[in-house]
Amino acid sequence: FPGVCSSYHLHHVAGKVVALAEFEEYGTAYAHDIIKNAQAFASALAAEGFDVLAESRGYTATHQVLTRHGDTDSGAGTKAARLLEDAGIITNMNMLPGDTKALTPSGLRLGVQELTRVGMGTLEMQEVAKLYARVLLHSEDPSVVKDDVAHLKSDFQTIRYCFNEENINGYPF
C-alpha cells in the first residue's frame, strides 16, 4: 500500500488548476526570461573567470548553467557547493563529462528559475556572478558574502509571473 495510487486527493485540484492557468497566461514570458537570464548568467560567470561549459553553443538553451571547478572526479564541485551554501547560495554539485564518481564531481549545476520568478533580470545575473566569484575565485569569507547575498535578495520579494502578483510576497519570514 498504496502502490501506484493512494486516492484522488481532490484537495490538490484547485491549486493545480490555478498553477496551470498561470502557466497558460505567463508561461511563455517566464520561460523566455529564464533562458535569457541563464545565458546572461553563464556569460557573466565566464567573464569573471569561471569555466562555463558549452560556450560555443551559447552556454545554455534551458534554465541550467554548468560550471567546472577542478579536475575530473576531484570533488571540487562538492567543495564549491558547500562554500556557496555557507554564503547563502544554494547550488547543486553535478557530475560533468569525464566524471565517474557521483560523490566527488567536478562541477556545479546552476539554475536561475527562482531568481527570475522574483523579478531578477540580466543585470542582476551579473551581480550574482560577482558573488560567486568572491567566494570561489577570490576566497572571500562566505559569511561576509552571505550578508551581501541577503541584501541583494531583500530587493526581490515579490513572486512574478502569476495572478495578482502585486499582492504576493513570496518570502514573508
Predicted regions and their residues:
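Active-site C-terminal subdomain of aminotransferase-like
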Residues: 1-72, 145, 152
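Short, well-ordered loop/turn and helix-capping segments at boundaries between secondary-structure elements
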Residues: 2, 22, 71, 86-90, ...
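Proline-rich low-complexity regions
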Residues: 2, 96-97, 157
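Conserved strand-to-helix beginnings and helix N-cap segments that scaffold or border functional pockets
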Residues: 28-31, 78, 122
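Short alpha-helical basic/polar micro-motif
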Residues: 32, 82, 126
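PLP-dependent enzyme catalytic core of the Aspartate aminotransferase-like
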Residues: 36, 102-173
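Generic non-transmembrane alpha-helical segments
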Residues: 40, 44-48, 79-87, 135-138
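Conserved PLP-binding catalytic core of the aspartate aminotransferase-like
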Residues: 52-119, 167-173
